[in-house]
């Protein structure tokens, strides 16, 4: 049995904002003798180079084909995944904050006009390309990676592991260019980065997955979605939940146990039955 908690997204370092919570996925993995599983525990998002919040990484159980250097290969190796929460934007008016990771879809970041879309089972969350700013990187979510927020000066700082291992500025917050938005959370498909009208769109949450890979099938699978910075009730009521994990970051509050502004890391628990 696998109990997979996604990591939370980061809050913005200057204003009263919140990152999104991580998703939660459970299921029984049918394994074969001598098989190898790779366990990925996602890291929380934190403030990026422009203080806006970056997206959380993803947590999951993968086949041995996961190597951390090819998004397409790693994506095909997914057995069960929980998505990360989206990062917050530089705006105290969009109080709901980054979208939570979830299943089947991640949650859209707030507000509806400029929040990044949640990842789905078949594609990354959309980028609301609007407003006065411009997106200078890849702002639409994709396989295992969240989109970059609208603005400039993106960077891998604050991005939750393992979203940044594939290169680029995926899941990064951004700022300037008339736009200050949060990064999308990573996941089976990542959430979109926030847009700019109204200024300060929050990132969308990444999607979970319970579909197995090859001979590693999943039975009794279920996935759950958080609501902005709060993880799903099924996650927090699990006997394997640890205080602070999966929570979205909150400005100036150590909500995730990793310091102020940062979300809570992910967690993976496996129970083996002979």
Segment roles from a protein language model:
Residues 1-10:
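Beta-rich globular "head" domains
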Residues 6, 41-45, 274:
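Surface-exposed loop/turn motifs at beta-strand-loop junctions within extracellular Ig-like
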Residues 77-80, 108-187, 191-206, 212-224:
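Acidic, glycine-rich loop-and-strand cores that form catalytic or ligand-binding grooves
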Residues 193, 199-261:
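Contiguous ligand/interfacial binding patches
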């Amino acid at each position: 049995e696998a109990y997979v908690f996604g990591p939370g997204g980061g809050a913005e370092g200057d204003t009263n904002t919140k990152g999104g919570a991580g998703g939660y996925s459970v299921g029984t993995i049918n394994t074969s003798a001598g098989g190898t599983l790779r366990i990925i525990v996602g890291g929380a998002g934190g403030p990026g180079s422009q203080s806006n919040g970056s997206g959380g990484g993803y947590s999951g159980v993968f086949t041995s084909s996961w190597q951390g250097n090819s998004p397409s290969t790693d994506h095909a190796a997914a057995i069960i995944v929980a998505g990360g929460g989206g990062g917050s934007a530089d705006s105290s008016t969009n109080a709901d904050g980054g979208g939570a990771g979830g299943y089947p879809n991640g949650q859209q970041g707030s507000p509806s006009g400029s929040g990044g879309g949640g990842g789905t089972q078949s594609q990354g969350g959309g980028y609301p390309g609007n407003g006065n700013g411009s997106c200078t990187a890849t702002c639409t979510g994709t396989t295992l990676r969240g989109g970059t927020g609208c603005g400039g000066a993106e960077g891998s700082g604050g991005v939750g592991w393992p979203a940044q291992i594939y290169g680029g500025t995926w899941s990064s917050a951004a700022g300037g260019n008339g736009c200050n938005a949060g990064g999308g959370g990573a996941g089976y498909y990542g959430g979109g980065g926030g847009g700019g009208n109204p200024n300060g769109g929050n990132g969308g949450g990444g999607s979970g997955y319970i579909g197995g890979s090859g001979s590693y099938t999943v039975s009794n699978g279920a996935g759950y979605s958080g609501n902005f910075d709060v993880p799903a009730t099924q996650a927090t009521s699990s006997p394997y939940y640890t205080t602070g994990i999966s929570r979205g970051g909150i400005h100036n509050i150590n909500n995730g146990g990793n310091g102020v502004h940062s979300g809570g890391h992910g967690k993976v628990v496996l129970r083996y039955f002979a």
